[in-house]
Design a protein with these regions (language model features):
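A cross-family acyltransferase "interaction/gating" segment
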Residues: 6-77
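Conserved structural elements of the adenylate-forming
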Residues: 21, 25, 135-142, 255, ...
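AMP-dependent adenylate-forming
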Residues: 106-131, 149, 273-276
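Conserved pre-ATP/AMP-binding loop-to-beta segment of ANL
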Residues: 116-118, 229-277, 284, 304-313
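Conserved AMP-binding/adenylate-forming core of the ANL superfamily
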Residues: 120-149, 153-170, 187-192, 250-253, ...
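Conserved AMP-binding A3 loop
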Residues: 128-134, 265-267, 273-297
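Conserved S/T- and glycine-rich ATP-binding loop of Class I adenylate-forming
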Residues: 155, 172, 203, 272, ...
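Structural core segment of the AMP-binding/adenylate-forming
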Residues: 174-248
C-alpha cells in the first residue's frame, strides 16, 4: 500500500491518507503493518521531476535503488505513527546512499562527459566563456602545476567568485589537495590565524585581484608577505595550445573510467576536500573540515529540493 495515494511531485514524503487504517480494522489479529521506503526513483524517467533533473540523473543501464524495510507495527497504528517510521527509514536509506557517493572530482568528470558539447558551462564577464569539456581541460592543466609546485596537502586560495576561481578550486581537488579559500574581507589577525591553523605555505591568487585588494583591504597584502605566492596569470602563460588541445581531446575520446584515473588524483570520498573558516568576528576563526562525502551529500540534497529546470542559472 502507498498511503500517500499519488506519485510524489517533489521527491519527498507527502500526507499519509488514513484509508489503510480502515483496511486494517477488519483483518485477522495476526496481521501487522511493515513500513518500507523506496530511495532512488526521484529523477528517473517515471518520476515527476523536471526534464533537466532526469537528464542529469541519467545513469545508463542501471541506477541505485534502495528498498528499506522497518520493524513490523501493530495493525492499529495510525497514519502519523506509520509516516514517522517511514521517515526514519528515509534517513537510514539516505545514510546508506551517501556511503557510495563518488568524490567531487569523479562526479564532475562524469557530469562533463554527459554535458552537451557546445553548451556554456562557465562565464564571468571577464574571462572567455567555457564549455564543460574546456573547463575540465583547463583545470587539468592547472592541476599538474599545482602538484609540481605545491607538495603540501593544504592549498590556500585567495580569489573572487569567477571562472578563474572555479578552475583553481577544481584543479586543486584534481591534484588531490585540500582547498582552503581565504576570506579576503577579513582582518589581518583572522587571515593570519586561518593560514597558521591550516598550515598553508602556498597561496594561489591573481595579480589583478591583488591590485584591487590593495585599494580596499591593505591588511591582506601584509598577511601575504613571507608566503609562497603563485599567480594564475603566470600559470596560464605556461599552458600552451598543444597541451590544452591534447587534454581536451582525451576528455572527448577516453572512456570515463580511464579519464578519471589519468586526470584525477582524489579517489577517497572520506578525504578532506575543503577547510572552511568562520569570519573571526567572535574571536579567532574556526576551521571546519569537510570531506568529499560531506559536500557531495549537500549537493545531492540541494539538487533534490531545487528540482533544477533547463533555464536555471547559478
Amino acid at each position: 500500500l502507498f498511503p500517500e495515494g499519488a506519485i510524489s511531485r517533489n521527491g519527498h514524503l507527502g500526507e499519509f491518507r488514513r484509508g489503510f487504517e480502515l483496511a486494517c480494522k477488519n483483518v485477522n489479529d495476526d496481521v501487522v503493518i511493515v513500513p518500507f521506503y523506496l530511495r532512488g526513483l526521484w529523477g528517473s524517467q517515471f518520476s515527476r521531476s523536471s526534464n533537466k533533473l532526469k537528464t542529469l540523473r541519467r545513469s545508463g543501464y542501471y541506477r541505485e535503488i534502495i528498498v528499506a524495510f522497518g520493524q513490523a507495527q501493530p495493525k492499529t497504528s495510525n497514519a502519523t505513527t506509520i509516516k514517522q517510521r517511514v521517515f526514519d527509514l528515509s534517513v537510514q536509506s539516505w545514510q546508506k546512499h551517501v556511503e557510495n557517493l563518488p568524490t567531487l572530482t569523479d562526479a564532475w568528470i562524469s557530469s562533463v562527459r554527459k554535458a552537451e558539447r557546445r553548451k556554456l558551462s562557465l562565464a564571468d564577464g571577464i574571462s572567455a566563456p567555457l564549455t564543460a569539456d574546456k573547463a575540465l581541460a583547463a583545470a587539468w592543466c592547472i592541476s599538474r602545476r599545482i602538484r609540481r609546485l605545491s607538495p603540501e596537502q593544504n592549498i590556500g586560495l585567495l580569489l573572487p567568485t569567477s571562472t578563474g576561481g572555479v578552475l583553481c578550486n577544481m584543479a586543486t581537488l584534481l591534484a588531490g589537495k585540500t582547498i582552503v579559500n581565504l576570506n579576503y574581507t577579513a582582518n589581518a589577525a583572522a587571515l593570519t590565524a586561518a593560514i597558521e591553523q591550516a598550515e598553508i605555505r602556498t597561496i594561489y591568487t591573481s595579480r589583478r585581484f591583488i591590485e584591487r585588494l590593495e585599494k580596499k583591504n591593505g591588511d591582506v597584502i601584509t598577511v601575504l608577505q613571507g608566503k609562497h605566492i603563485i599567480y594564475l596569470e603566470d600559470l596560464r602563460s605556461e599552458i600552451h595550445f598543444n597541451e590544452s588541445f591534447w587534454r581536451w581531446l582525451a576528455i572527448r575520446v577516453l572512456p570515463t573510467r580511464i579519464l578519471k584515473r589519468v586526470c584525477n588524483h582524489t579517489h577517497d570520498s572520506q578525504q578532506t576536500a575543503a577547510i572552511l573558516f568562520s569570519s573571526g568576528s567572535e574571536g579567532l576563526p574556526k576551521g571546519v573540515m569537510l570531506s568529499h562525502q560531506n559536500i557531495m551529500a549537500n549537493l545531492k540534497q540541494i539538487s533534490d529540493v531545487v528540482n533544477t529546470q533547463e533555464q536555471d542559472v547559478l
